[in-house]
Amino acid sequence: MTKITNDLFLRAARKEQVDKIPVWYMRQAGRSQPEYRKLKEKYSLFEITHQPEICAYVTKLPVDQYGVDAAILYKDIMTPLPGMGIDVEIKSGIGPVIHNPIRTFQDVDKLSIFKPEIEVPYVLDTIKLLADDMLEVPLIGFAGAPFTLASYMIEGGPSKNYHLTKSFMYREPEVWSILMEKLGRMTATYLIAQINAGASAVQLFDSWVGALSRADYTKYIRPVIEMIVREVKAVHPTTPIIMQAVGASHLLEEWETMPLDVVGVDWRETLTGARKKVPSKAIQGNLDPSTLLAPEKCLEEAERIIQEGILKPGYIFNLGHGVFPEVQPEMLKKLTNYIHDRSEILLKKG
């Protein structure tokens, strides 16, 4: 296995002292990069992820180009769902489309047991290739969290208000519980397999869970998240687990009482406010990705975030959501250098 020579990200995730703020970006690998767009002329997303050499190349590009302190495996949160019997297609300009949506108990009952080594060996092979031969920074594996996966499975695709998902949850609580159990077992198994293959940390993407009230989260979602985290920690107690959601500041206190290591926040919450709500966790975030399209505003916001970030150990610079396709790679490199250089100066001053 390649030795990790840059462990800034891991030290920050453990709330240890660092000499500069670590940086990585959600969706740093992919659609904003010319090299990736050229690949997409020939291959679909799923075709790229099924070829370990190509997928590893895409995953590593941002490390080489931007100087980020962690790589995140290039794949989609939908990747494991075909292994459960879900017919999913990624449509350009739309996103994931489910051709056999979940609407009844019978639909839930038919979901297959997910076995990573059988269903997604190419994901594990990509991780092994990166960890063994290619990366000197930590590799982050990830999975979609059950609510977000269920929202796609029930709605049949992207949704603005998740009304089919929430009404299913309210109307069929017992069936919902079975669905959460199945998705939770899949997610835990999937994350453990990624760590076994060489991932240094894992992130749970619950992109749409902010649509729920805290009361609904506590009742319908918290039990399955606790189960996932508990099962991963039982096998890999020292591997950092990151929780990332959008528009979910009202749920931060829920995560404070779980054995998570890092909590991601978006631009709707300040780092100082987040630290008050999750004092035991490292914080990741929280630049609005839209500012990457307005360079002066981006650096202005970055400076403000740095000033907050250095106040306490346990901070990782990231976006509050993914990089947009229109963002110029040069901007990400410039921002990475700025975060590194500026935070190093400020931390030296004490």
Curated annotation (Swiss-Prot):
Q: Does the keyword Cytoplasm apply?
A: yes
> What does the similarity note say?
Belongs to the uroporphyrinogen decarboxylase family.
What this chain does, per the entry, is described as:
Catalyzes the decarboxylation of four acetate groups of uroporphyrinogen-III to yield coproporphyrinogen-III.
Q: Which domain of life is it from?
A: Bacteria
Q: Which HAMAP family match?
A: URO_D (MF_00218)
Name of the featured protein: Uroporphyrinogen decarboxylase
Q: Which reaction does it catalyse?
A: uroporphyrinogen III + 4 H(+) = coproporphyrinogen III + 4 CO2
Among Pfam families, the record links this protein to:
URO-D
Locate the residues binding substrate: 27-31, 46, 76, 152, 207, 321
Which residues carry the site feature described as Transition state stabilizer?
A: 76
**Major localisation:** cytoplasm
Query: Gene name on record?
Result: hemE
The listed locations are: Cytoplasm
UniProt keyword annotation of Flavoprotein present: no
Q: Which Gene3D superfamilies match?
A: 3.20.20.210
**Main enzyme class:** lyase
Q: In which pathway does it act?
A: Porphyrin-containing compound metabolism; protoporphyrin-IX biosynthesis; coproporphyrinogen-III from 5-aminolevulinate: step 4/4
